[in-house]
Amino acid sequence: APEDAARYMLLCREQQFTLEELRASAAGVPLSDGDECTGNAEGEPVLCRAGRSSFWLTWDGRMIPCGMMASPGTPVLEQGFSAAWRSVRTEVEAIRLPAACAGCALRRHCNLCAASCFAETGDYDRKPDYICSLTHTLCRITREKYGTED
């Protein structure tokens, strides 16, 4: 359930971040945990390294942008490495994340990515309700625990 996952994520963050950083997060400042998959452009592109500066090779010889994505995939042995890399990069450039998420006040706190969208909805541009609920819950419990009374 999103509530349990959010509580676990907060426990992990408590090991990784200082009290001041957690309090700032409760006040709306995104934590910098090295996650490059955040942004705020409408229908934003893939912002992580998937298919932009990294790839995975599958057991059957396909090049895919990320270990969490089954497609797009290009057969390396049939097309050659350079052509497969160009194909994966071109296909990843065409992927757009949900426009509905771009205007969300919590977008900079969200772990939305193309793989999570596709895994939950079957599309890259449809909002994954689980990730959305998880983000809202994590922000709420962080505010409850680390927010300051004004």
PLM feature spans:
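Sparse recognition of residues in long alpha-helices and their boundaries
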Residues: V76-L77, C113, E120, T148
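Short, small/polar residue-rich loop motifs at catalytic or cofactor-binding pockets
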Residues: C48-R52
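Iron-sulfur (Fe-S) cluster-binding modules
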Residues: T142-D150
